[in-house]
Amino acid sequence: MAKRVLVVEDNELNLKLFCDLLRAHGYAAEPVRDGREAVARARDVAPELIIMDIQMPHVTGYELILELKADEALKAIPVMAVTAYAGREDEERIRGAGADAYVSKPISLARFMEAVRGLE
């Protein structure tokens, strides 16, 4: 059975790219367009990995990571942050919130998949 990956991204083009890339590599990608739905969807889908943008309207990926890691049922799920924030301080802050991997935009498809595989 394919590993389930929840992809939380408000940009439709990036969401499609990430989901298509994951599916092409044998993963079952579940898209979420609004960060406000991410925790409920994670409970429903029970993914093996959550990939999320950090810059989103309504709720940031940073806030979502904190919420996921505070939830007993979800805290063990690895989180990969995808962000335009490329500074060392940004990465430390995001990892400090609980992200298990960090990939900066613009995305290298090979690097993206390498980070995904590194969380298996």
Predicted ranges, named:
Residues 9:
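Conserved acidic carboxylate
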Residues 26-33, 41:
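Short hydrophobic/Thr-rich beta-strand motif most characteristic of the beta2 strand and flanking loop
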Residues 107-116:
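C-terminal output helix
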Residues 16-24:
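Charged docking surfaces used in two-component/phosphorelay signaling
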Residues 45-51:
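Active-site beta3 strand of CheY-like receiver
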